[in-house]
């Protein structure tokens, strides 16, 4: 069934690339208060590099902010005449309106910008089917930062699988958290899925806006209230309006991510996601909170922060992601084998983005394998047998498949899986996994 996915709250209509400070030529740039709140005014943006890929309603190619914009690729035909089809133009302008002297500047004005119109018709709007097509197309050319300023409360497994494929191919996914904070904050998808950077909205006082959906899956916050952006001229005669929503916080984070990735091109998508969280400007309660995640994205801090440890096996949250022929044809290679039955490896977990890791192992014939995760008490490891299909199996299947920390290989040896998961209320963990083979 087609589902409308657009996230927007209408407020009003209005008639290291160097350490140098940014200079904006556009007349309304001084009124774009959000630029200073994310540090975009304190450093000069780089030229085009890792692209920002906007999947949304159409972006108006005739608008003065985009008609002659360099480094802009329209990945399909754009339509902007439906009731909600101003949204993509606004989102794209927040991220990457050029410094062309017209009126406004995006967070990353020189960005390589890609736009995909995921609206099917003015009536049905953006649907899971069209988003899957968009992500599939963009994934062919990772790395990119994919911005999804939409969502819904009904998860689509097909969309999740495609997003996991994009992440595996080297793209970073950024999504709006949702605008249902005043309605109990129901879980929103795709924002709440692992490996998606979920973004909530803050105001000029760095306070979470009441409409911004909150939850333990939130990663970051960014300005999203009273934003000035471009719209098709049918929406407003002067081509601009003032809007609010997490839809407009997400492209700020997407632009920041593309900026940092362009300056620090050796980062993986997982490292970039971790870097943005670690360098965020903490607001609200100290540390992580459900309203602002790890804090407001901070571009200068992300440019300067140490490189996080790499987590090269992602995504590996479940058996289906590592077993060949299930989600991915090649799956993941076993971390142990008959010739090397013992191993130590280091990786990370994070509650909202990467809550568990699963590895394929080989248990040698007539030997036992033991597993442990050393992390200061924040993570634990356990073994699943060869017939397990997932780490969330029902109780009956668990009794058959869950082996604890020790497993015997039998007369011929056996495939198995090791799950490492966060314990208690831990938000993150840096762990060392030990897989040790022995006769007893």
Which residue stretches match the model-derived regions?
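Bacterial N-terminal signal peptides that target proteins for export
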Residues: 1-6
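Bacterial N-terminal signal peptides
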Residues: 7-14
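N-terminal domain-start motif of subtilase-like serine proteases
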Residues: 22-52, 74-86, 298
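Substrate-binding/access-modulating region of protease and related hydrolase catalytic domains
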Residues: 48, 115-195, 205-208, 214, ...
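Subtilisin-like peptidase catalytic core
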Residues: 50, 57, 70, 74-155, ...
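Hydrolase catalytic cores
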Residues: 92-95, 114-119, 144-145, 224-296, ...
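Acidic, Ser/Thr/Pro-rich low-complexity intrinsically disordered segments
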Residues: 155, 292, 341-432, 436-440
């Amino acid at each position: 069934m087609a589902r409308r996915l657009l996230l927007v709250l209408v407020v009003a209509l209005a008639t290291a690339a160097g350490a140098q400070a940014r200079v904006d030529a556009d007349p309304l740039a001084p009124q774009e208060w959000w630029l200073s709140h994310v540090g975009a005014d304190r450093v000069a943006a780089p030229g085009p590099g890792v692209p920002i890929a906007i999947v949304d309603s159409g972006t108006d190619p005739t608008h003065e902010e985009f008609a002659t914009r360099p480094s802009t690729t329209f990945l399909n035909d754009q339509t902007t005449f439906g009731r909600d089809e101003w949204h993509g133009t606004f989102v794209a302008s927040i991220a990457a309106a050029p410094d062309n002297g017209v009126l406004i500047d995006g967070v990353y004005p020189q960005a390589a910008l890609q736009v995909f119109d995921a609206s099917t018709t003015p009536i049905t709007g953006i649907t899971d089917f069209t988003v899957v097509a968009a992500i599939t197309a963009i994934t062919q050319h990772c790395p990119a930062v994919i911005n999804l300023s939409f969502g819904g409360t009904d998860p689509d497994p097909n969309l999740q699988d495609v997003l996991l494929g994009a992440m595996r191919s080297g793209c970073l996914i950024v999504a709006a958290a949702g605008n249902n904070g005043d309605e109990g904050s129901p879980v929103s998808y795709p924002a709440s899925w692992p490996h998606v950077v979920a973004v909530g909205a803050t105001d000029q006082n760095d306070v979470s806006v009441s409409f911004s959906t909150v939850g333990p899956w939130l990663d970051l916050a960014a300005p999203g209230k009273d934003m000035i952006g471009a719209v098709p001229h049918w929406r407003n005669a002067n081509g601009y309006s003032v809007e609010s929503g997490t839809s407009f916080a997400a492209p700020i984070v997407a632009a920041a991510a593309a900026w940092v990735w362009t300056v620090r091109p050796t980062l993986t998508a997982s490292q970039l996601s971790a870097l943005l969280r670690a360098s965020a400007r903490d607001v609200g309660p100290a540390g992580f909170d459900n309203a602002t995640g790890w804090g407001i994205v901070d571009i200068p801090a992300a440019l300067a922060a140490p490189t996080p440890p790499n987590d090269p096996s992602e995504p590996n949250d479940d058996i289906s992601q590592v077993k060949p022929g299930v989600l991915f044809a090649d799956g993941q290679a076993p971390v142990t084998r008959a010739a090397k039955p013992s191993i130590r490896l280091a990786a990370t977990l994070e509650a909202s983005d990467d809550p568990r890791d699963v590895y394929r192992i080989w248990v040698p014939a007539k030997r036992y394998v033991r597993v442990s995760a050393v992390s200061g008490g924040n993570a634990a490891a356990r073994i699943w047998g060869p017939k397990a299909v997932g780490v969330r199996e029902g109780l009956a299947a668990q009794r058959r498949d869950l082996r604890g920390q020790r497993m015997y290989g039998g007369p011929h040896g056996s495939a198995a899986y090791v799950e490492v998961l966060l314990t208690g209320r831990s938000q993150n963990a840096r762990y060392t996994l030990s897989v040790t083979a022995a006769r007893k």
